[in-house]
Amino acid sequence: MKVLLGVGGSSDSLTALEATVERALAAGDELTVAVVENPQSDIDTDEVERRVREELSSVPLEADVRRVEGDAGSRLVEIAESEGFDQIALGGGQTSPMGKINIGSIAEFVLLNAPVSVHLIR
């Protein structure tokens, strides 16, 4: 499976990175990591990219890492459609005190607009 993982620096997206790398290793998935700007994250994109590359260097997986400029949700959807990805993976989905799932604006846009399946990792 050809998987596009969006990582924006939130703790959820870094957790999604670990989980998606594990799955790619187990399933033989082709992984591309898109480092996106997330206005809700305190970590800048340089640091996010460094962490992504560090995580990938510790496993026997060749993955493409790219910096994606512009609106993160729109760009992830565009890339998935234009490059033939089978799935978009994203971190997100905190549970509220009332038991409802709260998702960020990037994940919401991707879930509502992606032409492929979306794997939301919590």
Residue positions per predicted region:
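Structural beta-alpha unit
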Residues: S58-L90, T95-M98
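Conserved hydrophobic residues forming the short capping helix/wall of the S-adenosyl-L-methionine
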Residues: A24, V52-L56, A80
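Solvent-exposed polar/charged
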Residues: E22-L25, E81, L111-L112
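Gly/Ser-rich helix-loop-strand patches that form or flank binding pockets
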Residues: Q87-R122
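Small/aliphatic-rich secondary-structure junction motif
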Residues: M1-I43
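General small-molecule cofactor/ligand-binding pocket signal
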Residues: T32-A34, D64-V68, H119
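Short, surface-exposed alpha-helical segments at coil->helix boundaries
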Residues: L17, D42-R53, G104
